[in-house]
Amino acid sequence: QTTAFAGKTALLCVLHCTCFLSVVYYACYGKMPVRCAGPAMRKRKRTMKIGFDNDKYLAMQSEHIRERIQKFDNKLYLEFGGKLFDDYHASRVLPGFQPDSKLQMLLQLKDQAEIVIVISAEDIVSSKIRGDYGITYDLDVLRLIDAFQGVGLYVGSVCVTKYTAAPEVEAFEKRLNDLGIRTFRHYKIAGYPNDVAHIVSDEGYGRNDYIETERPLVVITAPGPGSGKMATCLSQLYHEYKRGVKAGYAKFETFPIWNIPLKHPVNLAYEAATADLNDVNMIDPFHLEAYGVTTVNYNRDIEIFPVVNAMFELIAGKSPYKSPTDMGVNMAGNCIVDDEVCREASRKEIVRRYFKCLCQQKITGTVHESERYKLELLMNQAGLNVGSRAVEQQAHARSEATGGAPATAIELSDGTVITGKTGPLLGATASALINALKALAGIPQETDLVSAAAIEPIQTLKTNYLGGKNPRLHTDEILIALSSSAATNELAAAALHQLPNLKGCDVHSTVLLSGV
């Protein structure tokens, strides 16, 4: 840990997100048997608040997509936005939503669905990196193919958009073909997206390859934004109508949620998550005019709708939709079962995004001031400030009580806040982690789960033999030490088995955290 960023500018982490407790992150998804630690210990009751009905969502969302398929000629191109396998943002702001809910929903449609992955040739040539995984977009396409096939979903092909001849692109296509994956090419179109007459012609979409598909539901997905998902869908509609198939298009995105208020914290949290893109939630004026009903969409979809609508009219003779909201199929808003739980979770997420922005600004220096200003504005709209969370307040109180040394606070699911200080054996975050496990297992805080005699040789190894400067144990190191102690110490074993109960806890550190 470093104190270079002490004070109010601190890191907020959520354990099932990109988080400093990587070991806890994985442990949370394992099924660990609960071991009794004796009658003298009273374990803290797990009281995670649920605001979203995930089972209802899976059933309602899959059924709604089936209904949309039937509205067309049993052929629907579904533009799939957001993260499919690991939507941790949704799981944080909608407690009860599972990170893989969208994948599970698709699995209910797997006999009808096939996947087409699109990637821009420009991203292949530039070796564009996916920030959350740290891998290039072309490698992420291969990862997605393996992941889809691994759960039984059919991957029909890969489409290279904005195609230009380049050695990197040709090598990528060959690699896919060698793996038995078909590839298709879509080209840059002059005047896109405004010259609608040229786009919807033999010289526009007509130049693109027709992607051969087999199933009623074609899910168009990509490694990241700007890959050309919508353009691919519309190009396919053009070719389908040329072949006499009256196919349809729909858009699946979880956020913003169209049927909750514009300034609902869940929707504000979406703006916070996309502050770098400067997305803005808006009332859909087209929907309001057509139906007299207020719904929420975001600026890019609203701005492009007249163009998309004109394309529909040229392709099909008339547009099936009167508004951007009409194009969507999102049912998440209908599955919120406790609005206040979702509001509170979203408020925390907005502040977390603010701290994340400050951390990135400090670490990389690449964050624009406009992003920070927007996050401050969103906090103000939600009635929040940097001290709105109990963990922030108590982490700084603990730091002040220990002479300004780094401190960490963890809020358990029942609202109890556990703190950890910097000591001679453990860093503040490792200390908070152990203290939280003790609290969950009903173990007195003064109990040593790992003896100093066991920790000191690890410190010697770190500093004398591995070249480390900081002798204090980090989170991963104390968990390994705790695991070793659990073999002979029943209390340590009881604490270890509480790891899954840290899932979703709110954490605040008064300093930036080093990687472990």
Which residue stretches match the model-derived regions?
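Conserved glycine(s) of the Walker
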Residues: 227-228
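Aromatic (phenylalanine/tyrosine) cluster motif
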Residues: 5, 20, 25-29
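Short HxH-centered metal-ligating active-site micro-motif
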Residues: 439-471
